[in-house]
Amino acid sequence: MAIDVDRTLAVLRRKLEALGYSDPLEPASLQLVQKLVEDLVHTTDSYTAVKQQCAKQAQEIAAFDTRLESVRQDSVRLQSENSQLHVLVMQHAERHEREAREHYTAVKRLEDTIAELSYWKHAAAEKLASADKENAGLRKRCEELAKLTDRLASGAATPQSVAPKISSRSPIRVAPPPSPPRPRQATVDVLQAANGRILSLQRQLADATAELQELRQRVAEDEDQIRRRDVEIDRLGTRAGTDTNVLALRARNEANESMILQLNGTVESLAARVRELEAVEVRCEELQGALRRAEMDRDQAEERYSRSARDHDALSREVLGLRRDLAALQDTNNRAAGLLAADAAGASTPDTTAGAPALRQRLADSRADVERLSGQLAAADMERRNLAQQLSALRSELDDTQFLLAEAQSRAAGLAAAQAVAESEARRLAGEAAAREGRLRELDSQLAVVLSDLEARQAGFAALEKDRAEANARAEELARRLDEVERSAASERAAAAAAQQSVSRLDSELRVVRGSAAALEAEAAALRQELQDVSVGKVRATSALSSTEDEAVRARQQAEALRMQLTAERRAAEELRAGHDTLQLEVDRLGGQLALQQQEAELLRQQLAAARGELAASEAAASGAEQKLSGLGALSQRLEEMGEQARRAQAATAEAEAEAVRLRAAVSEAKEGQARAERGLREARREVEGAREAEALVRAQLREVEAQAEGTSKALKAAEADRDRALMDARLAAGDLASLRDQLAAETSSAADAGSTARQMAARLSAAERAAAAAQEERERAAVAAEEAEAAAAAARGREEEARAQGREWAERARRAEALVAEYEADVAQLRAARDSDAAALRSLEDTVAAARRDLDARRSEVEQLTTLSLRGDATVQEYMANLKAMSTDLRAAEMRAADLAGEAAAAQDAAASWRSEAEQLRGLLRQMDADRDNLQHELDAKAERLVAQEQQLAGAQAAEQEAARLLALAEGRLALTDNRAREGEAEAAAVRAQLAAALDSVRALSGEGEALREELRAVSEDLEALVRENQVVGGELAAVAAQRDSAAEEARRLGGRRASAEQLLRAKEAEAEDLRRVYEALAAEHRRLQGGVGALEREGAMREAALQAKAAEVSSLAESQRAAQATINQYVMDLQAFERQVDSLSRQLSQAEADGEELVRQREALLEEIRAAQQVRLGLERHREELQRQVASLDSQVAIGRARLEDSNSEAASLNQRLAMERSRVAELEGLLAGMRAREFRSDFASDRAGGQLAVMVDRNRALEEQVASLQHQVGALQASREAQDRELSRLRGEALALAASTAASLEGRTAAAGGAAAGAAKDQAAALDRLTSERDAAQDEAARLRGALAAAEAAAASASTAAAVSIPAAGSGSEAAAVLRVRCSELERRNTELMQELRTLQDTCRQQESLLSAAQNELSALQAEHRRLVELVARLDQDKAAAAAEAAAARQQVATATRRVATAEQEAAAGAARLQSQLRDEQGRRRQAERDFLELLSSIEGAGGEAAAAAVAAAHGEGAAELASRRLRELQTQVDALEAEKAGLEEATQRTRATLGAMSGQMAAIQAEYDATNTALAGLAGAMAAGAQGQGQVQGPAGTAPAAAAGAPGPQPGQAQAGGFGGAHGGGSISLSGGPRR
């Protein structure tokens, strides 16, 4: 039993020695001490387990808080997005209503146009029918006149039937019914074109209506989704309640939304300006089309005028000939009447009486001839007037039809533009749906993470409740046991000393733990702050992911636009294929007709060889086609641009996808790094919380856990509501995802179809070449047919000459006809020369129009570039603002982390190393992706080159086909002309034969009449020889008159034939002109369509280029710092303002070409633009003020943290004072106890041992005091770090104040007084913020003074403790060696304390230096305020001198230079501050290492020989920790210095890029100005050409108007003359009266 007791006692002593208790132990107190030791061990183990559980729960709660914060931020973001969607829906609804109104008006206009075209169609048909009827009547009249002339010549009609016009002895012959009139081909073509246009407009109207219905349905669906989303958000908002963070985020989102709305307003104003410019361009195109139509009309009118002039000259010559014949007949009549009167007066023989009836018969015949010729003359005049009226009516109808066609084309163009706008809106809605789908997916993933965390936390909460119950039970058990210990100590005096020592040790440990509780709570607060920083980093990653998803959405939109473009190109290819098939059918149809045109084919072969030579000499087949058709050159350029745009779009899509993948990988890696950091933090928390051994802290933590559990339960409910909402959104977005996948598959198939289309085009090209060869053979056959037709015409001419040779009396008329033909040929040559000159003028006008069109295209491209630049600027501003906010958040987080995370440097270094490795991996991945992108780009370039080659081949084939079609049309026209000429020759030959037969009949009739006269003369020859001679003379004259009459009739017939041929030629020319007009109209329409397509492709290319540049800017901006971003933003704001002024000036310059009535509208728009710019400046200043307010709030939080720390230090100082007082009282009690025990029970050696135990207690107390001094030093260092952070914040605020002053001075120079007031308000706000910072700095200085006082009190307490130890040592015994050693060690401790005081004084000196630096910063701030006031005064003066534009520009440049210098000064100050901080850091680190070494030496000297090994181990552990901490801290600072240098380099690079951008913009503006001048010159030339064309048209219409007047006025005198002649004849004849004169 004794052995067991001894063994148990030995084991217990070893345990007590392990616990640091070396006093002797009696066997009587064995059980009690063993029980106490077991309870202590059990309590320690339980406390450790509870502490670990609490740490785990705290970590879980922190993680849950982080996730809850992210969920809140997502909720705020969704609310902001909802508000944006509301704005978009309102805008979309307004746009939809506007489009609906425009569509309704367009439909009404189209209906009116269709009705008007239908009316004009019917009117034209009726006019054509009436014209054909009149023509048939005139032909019938001509035929009747010809037949009447033939009857008169043949003698079938008597003079009585001709002379009177009322009565006739012979019955009137009924003419055969005329053939039905045949409408002209030109009229039929015009009607067909009008019908086709009406049908196309109806189809377009139906398509537009269907698209409008579809858009309305989509808008309704979007509105329903948004409404459901609003309801869900409102429900969640009512359940979750409001939070300060939510309110702050709402305010920030409202500011962002205001900025976005302002930028949207700027973009809308620029877009409105662009639309106005496009309207001006459309107006110019309409004027060009009108000019071309006017030129064509002028050519047609000139041609018709020349024809009418030729007809008028021919009719005039015929009228003159008829007048001469009429005068000769009248003279002959008068002479015959005189002779008859003389014969009647002197005749007395029966022979004379017998010859008188014959003479009267001849006289009546001559009078009938005169009357007939007068009637023919009047009919010819009437026909000429009718032809003139018909010509004017047709001309007016043609003008009306052309005007209606132009108006219909313009309306169709407007409808197509509206359709394009609707398509763009549909694409935008699809992009928004895709963005919403991505957000829903993100919310779903976050909800899943939150649910898993909630489940884990619920399990942890249950375990925590169990552990808390166990800890409470153990605490109660411990209290009970402590009571038992106290009772046993009172009953057992023998073990009182050991019990008191154990209790005092436990009390000291509890006090130490309580003292360290505040420090641990501060560390916990620091860790919470770090968690907040991590959450902020997560928010940044989320924002980066959202921006990446936005880029992906834009890429999808670009892909959608590319798909639409490919669809349009496929449609165009289908149209080309249909046109090719139609052409092939036309060629096959013409194959049978061109079998006889061999001679024409030879000429066409030569032309084809020349064209092939030109095509072989040129670089592209499109140039030759452009020279021949003057319209197809833009097609090759458009195809090349389309290929380039396709390559760019594919590259942009690939880059966007690669960037999205890269950003997703970066986000995932960031999440992994965050997880590693969280693990490191958890490990650090476990290590820190291993030192907590107090029950009170456990209970406090348990209370905190309960509060957090309640908050977690609330957050769990909110998360469940979020989960329900996210699930509902996910179900709604599933359909959208499926539709987007289908669209992607369709795009892939469309790309494959494009490749197959290119191959099909190549095949069609070879088919077209074969068709061209077949057409050449057909042309050869047509040439043979033309030769045969010419041979037939030559034969007809030979027959005509033979007929002329047979009729001797027609020789003179034939010569006159030849003379007329020569005159006609001369007129034709003159007309050809005039036509050539007009063609040259037309070509020059076409060149002018082409130059104007090129200028307009350049202007359009410039406007689109400006629009792209503005869009790019807006996107860059938004990105910069987002990056600025993120960077400001990062900066504040970094400062707080640098101030609070000194103890967690090792984990941060590991995380930094892991991040570096991840960054290297990302760089390698980026390099690999760049290589893949280069390979893909190379493949795309190769494919694009092949596509361009194929497109060039296709363009060449199309040009060849169109050339072949043109040549075929010319051949058809020539063939038709040859046929008409052949028919005319045959008709003329038939007319000659008829005339010859009539002449032979008249000759036979005259010969018979001559025989009768000879018989009568032979009967009376014996008595009236003189009368016979006179009768012979009269007979000869009558024969001459009859010959003249016959010749006049023949001439009338010939003129009728020529008139018919002229009419046929006129119809052929009109048909050819109509064909040419249709061809030119088709070419013009195709050209306009191609121009529209080119413009659309250019705009799409610009949008893609803008998207690519925005992506590149975003990638580069991720590596920039806050100062670089701020400087770049300020510089860009100034550039944007200058650019807006340049845009305004350019718009004003462009608007000078418009009408004077629009001047007021332009001024109003300029004023509105200035007001918007002023509002933008005001909003920018407000944003700066809000940013300063947020910074001030962050400084307030930092000051509050400092104050809390100061309060903690004060409380710790108070606790130290209390401990010192307690220690003094306990020392006194121990001294009394020792004296009593010395006097009563113990020996001197036992007293010396007791004194050694008390010395050990004092050593422990001194160690605790030194630890407290070290904690105070740490707090002093933390305060210094916080002061340094405040100094950095002040320097940053100083830089921002400088940048704000520069931006304010640059932006307010050209603005209104309201902007100046806003700037002054912002300056006042900034001054107030700086004053507030100054007051806070003073408060921080006061707190530092208080802390120094607390440190002095702590040092005094340490000194008193050392004095107490020194006093207690002699009381133990003067002869003891331990007392001497203790005195030496206490003296060393005092010396070390003195050194620590010197170090504290050094720190105080450093604080004074910092105060001096703060005073210098205040001085600089006052200087900046003075500079700001000076700038405000300068702005006021500039507002007064607003008219001086040059001075304003110089001041702006000066302000830019000042801002640059200030930025450089700020950079230098930042570098100097960084170097100063680095030097201070090195000094502080050296001092700290020295203090640690001294402290370790002090500990080793105090503990003595017995504890040298343990002290050495502790010193080694502390030394290694300090060295590692110092090295890591140094590496972190070096990393920060490197980051600052990198930021400086980035700032310099951004400044250089900005300057280069400014230079490029100035060059672009100079080029734009030059092109604008060239455009003005071209427009002036075009206006002059239009004026000249209008003047020439007026001149043409003037003669054309006078000619009908002359034609109408010319016949007036002729009847008068005929009447006069008639009356003269009557008076000359005595009793003879003409029936034509008096009866009329």
Curated annotation (Swiss-Prot):
Residues 1619-1631 have a biased composition (Gly residues). Residues 154-185, 1592-1640 are annotated as: Disordered. It comes from the Eukaryota. GO terms for biological process: ciliary basal body organization; cytoskeleton organization; regulation of cell division. Residues 1592-1618 have a biased composition (Low complexity). The record marks R101, K108 as: Microtubule binding. One of its GO terms (cellular component) is cytoplasm. Residues 93-148, 191-232, 260-332, 370-411, 461-722, 758-960, 1010-1030, 1059-1086, 1129-1282, 1323-1494, 1523-1557 form a coiled coil. Keywords: Coiled coil, Cytoplasm, Cytoskeleton, Microtubule. Residues 174-183 have a biased composition (Pro residues). One of its GO terms (molecular function) is protein homodimerization activity. Residues 11-64 are annotated as: Homodimerization. The keyword Isomerase does not apply. InterPro entries: Centriole_BasalBody_StrucProt. It is found in: Cytoplasm, Cytoskeleton, Microtubule organizing center, Centrosome, Centriole. The keyword Lipid metabolism does not apply. Disruption phenotype: Basal body-defective and flagella-less phenotypes due to disorganized mitotic spindles, reduced rootlet microtubule bundles and cytoplasmic microtubules, and associated with abnormal cell division and slow growth. Heterogeneous cell size as a result of unequal mitotic cell division. Belongs to the CEP135/TSGA10 family. Coiled-coil domains are critical for microtubule binding via the formation of a two-stranded coiled-coil structure in homodimers. Microtubule-binding protein essential for cytoskeletal organization (e.g. rootlet microtubule bundles) and flagellar basal body/centriole assembly. Homodimer. This is Basal body protein 10. It comes from Chlamydomonas reinhardtii. The gene is BLD10.
